[in-house]
Every structure is written in C-alpha cells, then in structure tokens.
C-alpha cells in the first residue's frame, strides 16, 4: 500500500530498483532504456517508473540527496513494496590523481562520516559493504562491454560543502575512489531489512583539480554506467 512518500501499490515496483539521486535522471533512464515504462510514483516530485529491459521487469526511482533522504525511500521500497535489490546509480567526486572524470566506480565498501549505521548497530562500527554477487555481476557486465571500472571503497559524506578539506588528504591516503552522499546509508538499510545493494558511480568532478562535467551531462550522458547496471541485473538472473 502507499506510504507517505511513495503513492504506489504492491506489484508496481520490480524486485530490482535502480536509484539515481536526481528524479529527472530517473525519468531519463526510464525513457531511454526501458520499454513500456509507466510512472509509479510522483510524491514530492520523486519520480519512479517501472518498465522492462530486454524483457526483464525493472524499476527506477530517484532517492534525493543525502543519507536521510535515500534511507527513507530504500527502506519503504524494501519493506512495503517487496524490493530485493537496490542499485544506486549516481555521481561522485574524485580525490585521487589516477581517478579521472567519467571513470566508472563500483563501491565495494562505503566509508562515512554519518552516524546512521552506528545508530543501527548499537554504536559499533558497521562495515557497509555491497553484495558480492552484485559487485561481481557489475564487473562482468563492464568487461563484456569493454568498459574499465574501478572497484573499491567510496566515501559517503553528510556535508556537500565540507568544513574540513584536509579530510580529502586522508581519503586519498586510504585509497578512496570517490566521494558521494548516499551509498553507506543504502548499504545499511539493505543489511537491516534483508535486501541487497550496490552503488555504481560515474566521476562527475575532481575535487583536487576542479575539473567537472555539466549538470546536463550528469543527467543525460552517463549511459555506460546505466548499461552496466542493467546488464548486471540480467547476469544476476542467470545465477
């Protein structure tokens, strides 16, 4: 049944949902990659769609910015609409010199300065990691398309405008591939409620050099990342 944030019914969503932060990107994905896509949510402008990709039912829905927002939608999709897998498809900023604009990053683990997973885990550190099979399928899907991907830790930040830029030095030292704002929260929600999750990000800007893509490019042209996510779902069905 509908929730305060999602005006859909059981069965409206597929068991796998791709989740970009931007609801307009969700609309773009549905219109570009899915067949027979129909709108299944529009509460607060957080658009959601369900259609098919190569005959496979798949949904896509925005999750907003930051862990509090994405956690609401991820939790409700899992507990109220039967979603089993969530794939975050979004952007991240690079801090390492060897990570370039438009590189595709697969978040095997997600560090964070947020306390949400400590709140879930009795104030202990929780290792927020992606589902291994989903990681493997994404890597295999990328290889099949001859797309090079980076696999490793990302960092989910609570603040977009950080007051502590020296933290980027620490991230670089520890090999963080990209900085975003949601993956650790989605991984925590998935673990708490028995689902699986993965974050795939395209590098939209470089925090060190200032290089960046345009907002229009971030909405419309990260097609390789979306194709990897969709093809990984099909590989998962064949396991």
From Swiss-Prot:
Protein name in UniProt: Purine nucleoside phosphorylase DeoD-type
Keywords carried by this UniProt record: Glycosyltransferase, Transferase
Lineage per the UniProt record: Bacteria, Pseudomonadati, Pseudomonadota, Gammaproteobacteria, Enterobacterales
Sample GO molecular function, one term: purine-nucleoside phosphorylase activity
One example of a Gene Ontology biological process annotation: purine nucleoside catabolic process
Residues the UniProt record annotates as site (Important for catalytic activity): 218
Record-listed E.C. numbers: 2.4.2.1
Binding residues annotated for phosphate, in chain numbering: 21, 25, 44, 88-91
Positions with a binding annotation for a purine D-ribonucleoside: 5, 180-182, 204-205
Family: Belongs to the PNP/UDP phosphorylase family.
Function description: Catalyzes the reversible phosphorolytic breakdown of the N-glycosidic bond in the beta-(deoxy)ribonucleoside molecules, with the formation of the corresponding free purine bases and pentose-1-phosphate.
Active site location: 205 (proton donor)
Pfam families, alphabetized: PNP_UDP_1 (PF01048)
């Amino acid at each position: 049944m509908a929730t305060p944030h999602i005006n859909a019914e059981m069965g409206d969503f597929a068991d796998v949902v791709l989740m970009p932060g931007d609801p307009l990107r969700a609309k773009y994905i549905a219109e570009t990659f899915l067949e027979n896509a129909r709108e299944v949510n529009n509460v607060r402008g957080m658009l959601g769609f369900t259609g098919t990709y190569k005959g496979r039912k798949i949904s896509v829905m925005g999750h907003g910015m930051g862990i509090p927002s994405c956690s609401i939608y991820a939790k409700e999709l899992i507990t109220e609409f039967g979603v089993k897998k969530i794939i975050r498809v979004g952007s991240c900023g690079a801090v390492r010199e060897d990570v370039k604009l438009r590189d595709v990053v697969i978040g095997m683990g997600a560090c964070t300065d947020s306390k949400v997973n400590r709140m879930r885990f009795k104030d202990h550190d929780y290792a927020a990691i992606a589902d291994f099979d989903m990681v493997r399928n994404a890597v295999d899907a990328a290889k099949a398309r001859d797309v090079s991907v980076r696999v490793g830790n990302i960092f989910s930040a609570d603040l977009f405008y950080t007051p502590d830029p020296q933290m980027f030095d620490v991230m670089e030292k520890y090999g963080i591939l990209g900085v975003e704002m949601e993956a650790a929260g989605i991984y925590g929600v998935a673990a708490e409620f028995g689902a699986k999750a993965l974050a795939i990000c395209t590098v939209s800007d470089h925090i060190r050099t200032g290089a960046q893509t345009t907002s229009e490019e971030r909405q419309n042209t990260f097609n390789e990342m979306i194709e990897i996510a969709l093809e990984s779902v099909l590989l998962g069905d064949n396991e």
